[in-house]
UniProtKB/Swiss-Prot annotation:
A GO MF label: metal ion binding
Top-level taxon of the source organism: Eukaryota
Pfam families in UniProt: LpxC
The UniProt record lists the keyword Plastid: yes
Location of the protein in the cell: Plastid, Chloroplast
Residues where Zn(2+) binds: 80, 240, 244
Active-site residue numbers: 267
Chemical reaction(s) catalysed: a UDP-3-O-[(3R)-3-hydroxyacyl]-N-acetyl-alpha-D-glucosamine + H2O = a UDP-3-O-[(3R)-3-hydroxyacyl]-alpha-D-glucosamine + acetate
Name of the gene encoding the protein in the UniProt record: lpxC
The protein's name: UDP-3-O-acyl-N-acetylglucosamine deacetylase
EC number(s) reported in the record: 3.5.1.108
């Protein structure tokens, strides 16, 4: 195992999905063994304190994963960027955020992935990162959502979704083995966009949520059909669930080895899974 960082900084700006506020994010190289951390530089009333991707700093996982110390010093929507970081196997980065939320961009991780590749990823040293292995089988369920974890020799995910009232989606299952070394699947996962019911999104917008949502940064369906198709590939919605799960699993650490079977997964149950893994690690 090795440590990886980037050769030069990269910057991008964009709108936040939930707040609608424009944010700028700059990603810098970092020294070996330092890890990944975020800094909010736009808050003049607070000292600049690193926010480290960790289960201890999860403030909210209802609609997305929010990290921070309190609501005023937090970072919203980390999962798409963290998924790109994991798929790139990066271990050491300093990430400066000017704004409350990481930009949604096109609703997937592909722009993040390409941005990191443009920054030229390289090996800095041998890694001392802990490889997290699950030695037991366990089951987590919330209503009709569940995740089962099995011991495995690498990271593998089998996930399913079920939208019986939407003919465009219906039931989808996808299995991806050896996730972090399966280069064939990497672009497909990273390109998968977030999605939702057009009518429900409009209701949430009127309630003050999803202020940055539009038909460019999210797939929307209505009356069983896509409002802004076509899909980039078959099972794009199911693959986006894999993308989100990879991003949330990055809170465990760099290298994870287990086989997950998930059904109707969301950020809340993903957070429960990560917290359970952390308890096993003690």
């Amino acid at each position: 195992m090795y440590n990886y960082t980037i050769y030069h900084p990269v910057k991008i700006s964009g709108r936040g999905l939930y707040t609608g506020i424009n944010s700028t994010i700059t990603i810098y190289p970092e020294l070996p063994h330092v890890g990944i951390y975020f800094l909010r530089t736009d808050l003049t009333d607070y000292p600049i304190v690193p926010i480290i991707p960790s289960t201890l700093l999860v403030l909210n996982s209802k609609l997305s994963t929010v990290l921070g110390f309190h609501d005023d010093y937090s970072i919203m929507l980390i999962e798409h960027l963290m998924s790109a970081i994991s798929l790139s196997q990066l271990t050491d980065l300093k990430i400066i955020l000017e704004g409350p939320e990481i930009p949604i961009l096109d609703g997937s991780s592909i722009i993040w992935l390409k941005l990191l590749q443009q920054a030229k990823i390289y090996i800095t040293s041998l890694s001392n990162c802990i490889i997290f292995k699950s030695s037991c089988t366990f089951f987590i369920q919330t209503k009709d959502t569940f995740i089962i974890s099995f011991p495995y020799t690498s990271l593998a995910i089998n996930t399913g979704i079920d939208f019986k009232n939407c003919l465009a989606i219906k039931s989808q299952w996808i299995t991806i083995l050896d996730l972090l070394i399966n280069r064939f699947e990497l672009v497909g996962i990273a390109s998968s966009r977030t999605f939702g019911d057009f009518n429900q999104i409009n209701i949430l917008i009127n309630e003050g949520f999803f202020q940055g949502a539009n038909l460019y940064n999210a797939l929307a369906f209505q009356l069983g059909n896509w409002c802004n198709g076509p899909l980039r590939f078959i099972c794009e919605p199911a693959k986006h669930k894999v993308l989100d799960l990879i991003g949330d699993l990055r809170l465990l650490g760099v290298y994870n080895m287990f086989f997950l079977i998930g059904y109707k997964t969301n950020h809340f149950v993903n957070s429960q899974l990560v917290q359970f893994f952390k308890k096993l690690d003690k």
